[in-house]
Structure formats: structure tokens, C-alpha cells
Regions:
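Alpha-helical scaffold/interaction cores of sigma-54-like transcription cofactors
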Residues: 1-606
Length: 606
């Protein structure tokens, strides 16, 4: 039987350095307690919206997509929770969150103007915020009843029938001061109540590791009295515990179920979405790809396959396997629905080459495509080197094609700028990545927070085997490293260091930007995914990481900046100044002098 309560304010590990609740933990806690639904309401972001939706759906728990955000009016600001009721509400949530993050300056908090929210909130429910810094709750805690009335009136007018006065009981004095004020105004204005628990960790005994995590995120020490902290009550309570906590206000518990029943939206996975490729000849994508590929192949055959003195019969014999392979590949590409992808990639590579921007010859499985060779995406003859197209695209293994494309590091931004101009600045974005607390970093950060001697912590951290390709966890190291086990047994402080580190190991610590990946949409990207701003880049960044942005339907294009190409271009330019002309593409791959130079071991790289 479903539990009679739903958590509507849950911070996952995507609330960076604010929560220890991994999505798997939320799934287990809600499912294990038979809670019919659960909301994710991360701080000013929707990083985990799609992943959360899929994981909860797998567990048979209804996902509710939400957001804890700061809203502002002429009197100040405060936090509220927004929940998506419908697809329109989810899209509005993405819009508001994207714009708040893209507009933020410096170290300011992202915020949404109430005026803007009032004009665009179809399909959203609003919870009025807690007593600590809530838009309504904080004013109630300070006894500012006029401001409470004013703000509640504005919210009810903006969200007719979709506002709930939020009550929280974490044992804080501000909550006890705010509650009678909130109850009075809610009853007087006939606004429904709802009980929430601001969930930040799994169980009460996780309060210490959570405190340490907060200190890591804020650069504080555990012993500091004025540091941010949460109470032991900020854990993921069971439905029974919540019902007992609010036994005197049962409607506040019942309304969690009412809200869950009103919410039917979730972030959806989509098939790949690409912008339409506009052919100058007015052809459809399949016909345009066939035209460009056949014309390009003939140029390649004349430049690389046919030799002087070949008669017509010899040329036809040499060309036959290439033309046959081209037709086969075009059939697969069209069958799988990817002609537009090849045309888009070919377009920006041809643009770069026309402007003497060095482009790599091709690497990875994409080098096995004759179509890619014909379009000048790659410069390697797949038949000459026996490369297989099926490693790149295979109808039996449906996945997006993925060319690894290298550009001169100094001029990569020019190519990205061209793509932005061609498809629209609001339709192109970089992809987010998340840095996590791996074993050694976790130990060092926890040691700093606990104010342990650096030399001692460093010695312990170095007992974790270093393997960047497959990082070793603390638990794995304890199985193999006797010295680490000995320190844990014999030194109580080291034991505490290791135990806390194990509990926060793997949690996300910060967000950054994927080094090469870009997505290009067929519409403004905020209509498809929430967006984020990396302070180090002027370009928008998707809030979903590479795996989940592709599941959301966006296609990744790699724009890798390769320093080697820059060095080669400069070398060719320096030689030209001395009257020596070199074409890198015509240097034979079996050049003896090149191998002699490489064998001497005097090169930086190959």
C-alpha cells in the first residue's frame, strides 16, 4: 500500500557540495518506504532532472521535477520551490532557470524576478519557502505580517489555485516563530498548507559527513562556529515520521499527495534532434548527401586513386569498389536517419579548410567511412588501409555517429563562431561536466576541514594507488593496502578521516565544461534542455552532461583543439618564408627520413 506522504523538497548530490543524496539513494529511500512519488528540488539548477526522471521511473516511483530558486520583488528576495505539473510547466521551469543562470554576474546568486515569473508560469505549482530564507517564510519568522500578506497576495494572483504555504519542522527557532504567522494567513486567505522536510542526507547519522561536505564547498573548517550548517533533522524521513511530526496538521501531509497527483510532468528522453540542413540546390538531405558524396568521391579518385597512364577500363576497375562502398554506406546512413549529421559536419569542416584552418586527417572509427572521405570530413582512404565502416555505423547497433574532429588550437574558436552564426547563438551550446570527489581528493579535503596536519593527511592519501584511467576507491584500497588498514585501526583520527571520506567520496564537487563537445539544436536550446553558464566561457552550457544531453535528443559534435596542428601550420609557414614549399598531405607515409627522425627519439610527440 502506498505511503500517505510525498517528499516535495529533496536536494540531490546535484546541489553541488550541499547534499549527500545520490539519485540511487533517493530511489531506494522513496521506494523502500512505498512513497508513491518524490520531487527533486536542487538549488538553482536542474542538472539531474532527466537522470532523476529515468531512475525513478525504473523504480516505480513517480518523479516530480522541481527547483529551489530565489525570486525577487521590490522589497527583497527569498527562496521558493517550483514544481512542474505538466509539460508546459517543465518547459517554463527550464526557461526561468536557464535565464537566471545565464544572466547572473560574477559571484551573485541566480534569481528570477517575480514580475517575470508572474507572466510565465503555466503548469507550475509554487511552495512559499522555508522560514530560514524563504520568500514568505523568512518574513513570517521576523513578524513582518504586512510583507507576508503582500507577498502571498502577489503569489496567489500570479499562481491562481497553485500556491501552497510551506511548513517545515527541523527544530529551528525561526520555524517555531514563523509557523503561527503562516497558519493564520493561510487560514485567513484560504491557501492550502503543505509539509516539507528539506532533505539533504540519508539518515541522522549522516549529519557529520554532510557538515564536512558543506565545509568543503564553502572553504570552511568544521570547528568554526559561524559556518553554514543543517540540523540532524534534515534527513530523508519516512512517511510515518512525517505524519507523526505533523500529526496536529494532517492536511499538510495529505496535500503532499494532492500535489503529487496534480503533477504529471517528467523530463523525457527523445530521439536525436538535428537542425535541418539547407541545400543551396534546394534538395532534401538524402539527395544533397548523395550529390555531395558522389561529386567528392570523383575528386578523391582522380587525386588519390587513379594514376597516370591508366586507361578507362583500369580506372573503372579501380573505382568500382569505392563506388560500391559509397552506395552501401549511403544506404545505411539514410536508413538510420543520419544524412543531416554528415552534411552538418562536412559543412563546417569544408568552411574551415577553405580558410586555411588546419583540420586533422581523421581518427577513430569515423576514418572507416568512404562517405566521410568523399565529403572531406576525413583525409584517409578507408579502402587503401582496410578500414571498416561498420565500426562507425551499424544498423544492428543503433547509436549516433561521432566524428572526433581536430582543429588547430589557435583557430578552433573561429569554426565554433561560424557554427553559432549559421545555426543561431541560442541553438548552440557546450556540454557540462561534473568534477567529483575521488579518493585522494576526498581525503585531503576532509583532512583540511578537520584541521589535521597536512603531512599526515598527505601520507594517508598517497596510500591510495594512483590509477587515473580507473580510479581506485578508498574501499578498494583498504582491501589491498595493509598499511592503510593499520593506520585506520591504530589512529582514531585517521579512522574518522577515512570513514567520513568514504561517505562523501564520489559526490559531485563542481561543474565545468566539456573540452570539445558542442550540441546544435533545431530550436532555441532552452526549449529542449535547461542551460547553465560557465563563468569562464561566454557560450551557454547544457545542464545535462554528455550522456544525458544525448538522451534528451541533442547531438554532440566534437571540436577538439589540437596543438600539434598549430605547430605543423607554423612550421609550414616558417619554411615558406625560406622559399621551401611543403604540402603535408603529400608527404608519403613510408618516408624513410621521417622514420629515422622518429627513431632518434628527439621528437616531442608523433
Amino acid at each position: 500500500m502506498p505511503a500517505p506522504f510525498v517528499h516535495l523538497r529533496v536536494h540531490s548530490a546535484y546541489s553541488l557540495a550541499e547534499s549527500t543524496l545520490r539519485l540511487k539513494s533517493i530511489m531506494a529511500l522513496a521506494g523502500g518506504d512505498s512513497q508513491p512519488a518524490v520531487a527533486i528540488t536542487d538549488t538553482s539548477n536542474m542538472f539531474g532532472a532527466l537522470e532523476f526522471s529515468e531512475k525513478m521511473r525504473e523504480a516505480g516511483v513517480q518523479p516530480i521535477i522541481g527547483l529551489e530558486c530565489i525570486i525577487a520583488d521590490s522589497r527583497g528576495r527569498g527562496e521558493v520551490v517550483l514544481l512542474a505539473q505538466s509539460e508546459a510547466g517543465y518547459e517554463a521551469l527550464c526557461r526561468h532557470n536557464s535565464r537566471a543562470l545565464l544572466d547572473v554576474e560574477g559571484g551573485d546568486d541566480p534569481m528570477i524576478q517575480l514580475e517575470s515569473l508572474a507572466q510565465d508560469n503555466e503548469g507550475m505549482i509554487l511552495l512559499t519557502g522555508g522560514a530560514v530564507n524563504g520568500f514568505v517564510g523568512a518574513a513570517a519568522a521576523e513578524g513582518q505580517t504586512a510583507l507576508v500578506d503582500e507577498r502571498l497576495s502577489a503569489l496567489v494572483q500570479a499562481f491562481p489555485g497553485r500556491v501552497y504555504v510551506e511548513l517545515q519542522r527541523h527544530g529551528l527557532d525561526v520555524e517555531r516563530r514563523a509557523e503561527p504567522v503562516l497558519l493564520n494567513v493561510a487560514v485567513a486567505a484560504d491557501i492550502p498548507l503543505v509539509a516539507t522536510n528539506d532533505c539533504r542526507f540519508e539518515k541522522r547519522d549522516m549529519v557529520m559527513p554532510h557538515d564536512v561536505l558543506l565545509c568543503i564547498g564553502n572553504g570552511r573548517k568544521l570547528a568554526e562556529d559561524d559556518r553554514p550548517r543543517f540540523t540532524p533533522e534534515h534527513y530523508f524521513k519516512t512517511a510515518e515520521e512525517m505524519a507523526s511530526l505533523f500529526a496536529d496538521i494532517p492536511e499538510a501531509i495529505r496535500n503532499t499527495l494532492v500535489i503529487a497527483q496534480r503533477c504529471s510532468a517528467m523530463a523525457e528522453m527523445r530521439k536525436p534532434i538535428l537542425p535541418p540542413f539547407e541545400s543551396e540546390a534546394g534538395l532534401g538531405e538524402e539527395d544533397e548527401l548523395q550529390r555531395q558524396a558522389k561529386e567528392g568521391l570523383e575528386e578523391r579518385l582522380h587525386g588519390h586513386v587513379f594514376s597516370e597512364g591508366m586507361d578507362e577500363a583500369a580506372r573503372e576497375a579501380a573505382a568500382a569498389p569505392y563506388r560500391e562502398r559509397l552506395e552501401f554506406e549511403l544506404g545505411v546512413i539514410n536508413q538510420m536517419g543520419f544524412p543531416g549529421y554528415f552534411l552538418i559536419v562536412a559543412d563546417f569542416i569544408q568552411w574551415a579548410k577553405a580558410r586555411d584552418i588546419p583540420v586533422g586527417p581523421g581518427r577513430g572509427s569515423g576514418a572507416g567511412s568512404v562517405v566521410a572521405w568523399a565529403l572531406s570530413i576525413t583525409d584517409l582512404d578507408p579502402l587503401r588501409w582496410g578500414l571498416l565502416f561498420e565500426r562507425f555505423l551499424n544498423p544492428e547497433r543503433v547509436s549516433m555517429p561521432d566524428f572526433d574532429i581536430d582543429f588547430c588550437q589557435d583557430r578552433r574558436e573561429e569554426v565554433i563562431g561560424y557554427v553559432q552564426e549559421k545555426y543561431g547563438f541560442d541553438k548552440v551550446a557546450q556540454i557540462i561536466t561534473f568534477g567529483s570527489l575521488q579518493a585522494r581528493a576526498a581525503l585531503r579535503d576532509v583532512g583540511r576541514v578537520l584541521e589535521m596536519p597536512y603531512s599526515q593527511v598527505d601520507r594517508i592519501a598517497k596510500l591510495i594507488p594512483s590509477n587515473p584511467a580507473n580510479p581506485v576507491t578508498i574501499a578498494q584500497a583498504l582491501e589491498t593496502e595493509e598499511e592503510l588498514r593499520k593506520h585506520r585501526r591504530e589512529d582514531e583520527q585517521v579512522g574518522e578521516l577515512i570513514d567520513i571520506s568514504m561517505k562523501i567520496e564520489g559526490l559531485y564537487r563542481h561543474a565545468s565544461t566539456h573540452a570539445a563537445g558542442l550540441v546544435i539544436g533545431d530550436r532555441p536550446l532552452e526549449q529542449l534542455v535547461p542551460l547553465y553558464r560557465d563563468p569562464r566561457s561566454p557560450m551557454p552550457v547544457t545542464q545535462f552532461n554528455m550522456k544525458w544531453v544525448e538522451n534528451a535528443g541533442l547531438v554532440k559534435f566534437d571540436f577538439l583543439g589540437l596543438k600539434t596542428l598549430t605547430v605543423l601550420q607554423r612550421a609550414v609557414a616558417f619554411l615558406a618564408q625560406r622559399g621551401v614549399e611543403i604540402d603535408l598531405e603529400t608527404i608519403p607515409l613510408d618516408d624513410a627520413k621521417t622514420f629515422e627522425m622518429l627513431s632518434a627519439g628527439d621528437t616531442v610527440g608523433v
